[in-house]
Design a protein with these regions (language model features):
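Structural preference for solvent-exposed beta-strand-turn elements
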Residues: 1-177
């Protein structure tokens, strides 16, 4: 028992903290949690981790009709993932901070039967899924023009079986280590 003990708890008024911005919940982009989690997993590794170029610390989310293109780059590597959406949406380009995507990836269940709604304003993105709402500021600026870097007119194009190729790489790594 505490009987005569007294405690002083120091706190701040709720008015000292900023409120979440009001984001109109119309025209949402709908994705499955599994798809969003996979897209983040497949692109997050090539985000720049320094602040010399703030734009490269985020990922470009570009919507053209029923196609979502997610791009990240650290200046040396480029990750590009295209997803065909179920519906058609107005064209939009935003740069989502990598830290936000990393946190989203941790709390998504990855269930293919559950959806995520993405809402955009000029300065914010809102992720809404299950009973969770995440709001983040967008990175302002123009992302790299990836289409200029990755042209489609290659002199040589090779199509390979991914599993066989990875198996050969694993085998060569065994020989190298010996």
């Amino acid at each position: 028992t505490c009987e005569k003990a007294t405690f002083n708890i120091i706190g701040k008024s709720g008015e000292d903290f900023s409120y979440l911005p009001q984001i109109e919940r119309s025209d949402s982009i709908l994705l499955s949690q599994f798809t969003l989690k996979e897209v983040i997993r497949q692109t997050i590794f090539s985000i720049a981790d320094n602040f010399t170029n703030k734009i490269l610390t985020g990922e470009l989310f570009e919507i053209n009709g029923n196609l979502l293109k997610v791009v990240s780059s650290d200046g040396l590597r480029i990750s590009l993932r295209r997803i065909e959406l179920k519906n058609t949406y107005p064209d939009k380009k935003v740069i989502v901070p990598g830290k936000t995507l990393n946190e989203i990836s941790k709390i998504l269940s990855g269930d293919a039967d559950k959806d995520v709604n993405l809402f955009f304003t000029d300065k914010h993105i809102l992720f809404e899924f299950d009973n969770t709402t995440v709001v983040s500021r967008l990175i302002e600026g123009e992302y790299l023009k990836i289409d200029n870097i990755l042209s489609a007119d290659y002199e040589t194009k090779v199509k390979i079986n991914k599993r066989e190729f990875l198996s050969c790489i694993d085998l060569s790594l065994i020989h190298i280590s010996e």
